[in-house]
């Protein structure tokens, strides 16, 4: 064991001598070092604007959703048949444990031509592919089902913010005077243009349709008046027989059940059955509805949505592989500016809305963190120069964090931004060790250059040890797998990359900054230092520095 410690100390001493040699060389070219530091500030600013932004990483939650949308007007049996075909394809995957299909249901309403399949996956450690990769492999297989649109999607990262991952774009009729045909035309142009964008995953789609087969029932009010039939009675009859109506409750085995009345299925399966219903007139005569109503086949929208009081159509999509949600949002906004007429507008909903509203807060929070640390350090050192020197090491950490995110293909999301705030303290810690010790030596009368070099040399070992412990502690987050891996990888990569780069560069940059800024302080503030005693060949001499 002693041999191991001896080798370790020998390595440390070699590193220390090499570091001292390098630092002495850099002191001679301070102007070049400062120039490179300013260049790194520019690179950091460029990285901050060029690294793709997003709100939250797309997580593997152990399941995914498959949306099934058949042609308008088809029966539930038709939809169920298509869903069984989709389930057969899904169950062929070795990563799948089971499926749960719900026909006649969609996240925008209950209709016979819609269905949803929930697919559960094996535990993360038992499969080699993530949910996103499985969804990508299923895209081509499920698109081969031509009887309906079958689309696998990831669930939303935060439950309640949207029905599935990606963005929700609300196309709005701002003027309020456009009919459905006009809205459909504008929507078609928007979708056609959006599906040509390289930043958007194909398809960008909507579940809205305005061609659902319907029956228009027109009541002949004059005829009803002549037969002394109340028009409200006609509407109530249609509601009771064709829809349903709540009557009362009853108790059975200590549970309460609701009672609804409705015509049996065989008596409301054809449009002609409407004419066979009867209403009572004021003279107690039973009048068939065939004498009072006119039936006209037509088409229309199953549901008409409104968003913030405007009639709207929801459009769904997601970022293309290798692109961020911020780039996808920007691409949709560019398409909307090119395509939408002046009477139409748009808004974001779901997680895209959260990303838009919170996107501008990250620089503010980071800036407040810098101000808070600066004020604390200013109170500790009783000046503003030392805190400035210390905080100038933070951009080095930001540069390392954003470089690591970019190299790994990760986005500047909320977890990366949390990591940047953490790096304010982690990067400042290394600079504090150098500045604190250099101040002590300088106040004893040692020249500022010699004080900075000696302080950096003396503090090398604690800086490396604390940085190494931090890097070893954060590294498992950077390579995390399983549940929540996306958020952990984003946070771990940002902190690991920032700490690694900041530790290495600050060892050379901070002493130079201390020398340059400290010299300017001493020159312009006329700061005097006490005499410094130097022992040389057994003789003690006193040097006075001004």
Regions found by a protein language model. Give the residues of each.
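Hydrophobic alpha-helical transmembrane segments of membrane transport and translocation systems
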Residues: 482-538
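Signature of alpha-helical transmembrane segments and their immediate interfacial
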Residues: 2-54, 536-546
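Alpha-helical membrane-interface segments at transmembrane helix boundaries
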Residues: 12-30, 52, 56, 87, ...
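AMP-binding (ANL) adenylation modules
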Residues: 105-108, 160
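Hydrophobic alpha-helical segments of integral membrane proteins
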Residues: 1-26, 292, 354, 388, ...
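Surface-exposed amphipathic alpha-helical segments in non-transmembrane regions
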Residues: 34, 65, 78-101, 113-213, ...
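Transmembrane helices with small-residue packing motifs
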Residues: 37-74, 126, 152, 165-166, ...
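Hydrophobic transmembrane alpha-helices and their membrane-interface caps
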Residues: 372-459, 464-483, 497, 501, ...
């Amino acid at each position: 064991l002693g041999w191991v410690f001896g080798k370790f100390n020998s390595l440390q001493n070699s590193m220390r001598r090499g570091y001292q040699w390098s630092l002495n060389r850099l002191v001679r070219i301070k102007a070049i070092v400062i120039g490179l530091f300013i260049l790194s500030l520019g690179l950091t600013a460029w990285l901050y604007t060029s690294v793709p932004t997003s709100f939250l990483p797309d997580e593997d939650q152990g399941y995914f959703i498959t949306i099934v949308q058949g042609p308008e007007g088809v029966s539930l049996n038709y939809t169920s048949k298509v869903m069984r075909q989709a389930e057969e394809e899904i169950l062929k995957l070795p990563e799948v444990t089971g499926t749960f299909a719900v026909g006649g249901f969609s996240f925008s309403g209950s209709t016979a031509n819609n269905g949803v399949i929930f697919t559960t996956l094996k535990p993360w450690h038992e499969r080699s592919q993530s949910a996103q990769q499985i969804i990508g492999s299923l895209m081509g297989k499920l698109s081969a089902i031509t009887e309906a649109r079958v689309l696998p999607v990831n669930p939303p990262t935060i439950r309640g913010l949207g029905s599935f991952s990606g963005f929700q774009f609300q196309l709005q009729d701002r003027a309020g005077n456009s009919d459905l045909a006009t809205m459909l035309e504008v929507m078609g142009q928007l979708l056609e243009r959006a599906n040509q964008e390289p930043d958007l995953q194909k398809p960008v789609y909507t579940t809205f349709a305005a061609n659902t087969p319907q029956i228009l029932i027109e009541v002949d009010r004059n005829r009803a008046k002549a037969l002394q039939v109340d028009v409200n009675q006609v509407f109530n009859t249609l509601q009771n027989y064709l829809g349903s109506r709540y009557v009362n409750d009853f108790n059975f085995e200590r549970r309460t059940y609701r009672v609804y009345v409705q015509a049996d299925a065989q008596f409301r399966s054809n449009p002609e059955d409407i004419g066979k219903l009867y209403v009572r007139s004021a003279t107690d005569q039973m009048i068939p509805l065939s004498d009072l109503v006119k039936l006209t086949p037509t088409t229309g929208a199953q549901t008409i949505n409104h968003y913030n009081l405007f009639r709207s159509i929801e459009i769904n999509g997601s970022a293309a592989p290798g692109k961020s949600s911020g780039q996808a949002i920007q691409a949709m906004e560019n398409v909307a500016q090119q395509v939408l007429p002046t009477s139409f507008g748009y808004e974001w909903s779901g997680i895209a809305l959260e990303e838009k509203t919170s996107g501008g807060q990250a620089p503010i929070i980071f800036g407040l963190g810098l101000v808070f640390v600066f004020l604390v350090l200013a109170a500790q050192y009783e000046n503003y120069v030392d805190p400035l020197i210390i905080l100038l090491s933070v951009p080095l950490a930001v540069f390392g964090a954003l470089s690591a995110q970019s190299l790994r293909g990760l986005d500047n999301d909320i977890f990366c931004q949390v990591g940047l705030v953490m790096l304010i303290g982690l990067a400042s810690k290394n600079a504090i060790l150098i500045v604190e010790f250099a101040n002590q030596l300088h106040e004893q009368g040692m020249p500022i250059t010699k004080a900075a070099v000696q302080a950096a040399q003396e503090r090398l070992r604690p800086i490396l040890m604390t940085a190494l412990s931090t890097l070893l502690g954060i590294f498992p987050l950077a390579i995390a797998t399983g549940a929540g891996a996306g958020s952990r990888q984003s946070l771990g990569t940002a902190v690991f990359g920032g700490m690694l780069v900041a530790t290495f560069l600050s060892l050379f940059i901070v002493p130079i900054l201390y020398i340059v800024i400290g010299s300017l302080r001493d020159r312009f503030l006329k700061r005097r230092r006490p005499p410094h005693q130097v022992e040389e060949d057994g003789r003690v001499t006193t040097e006075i520095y001004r």
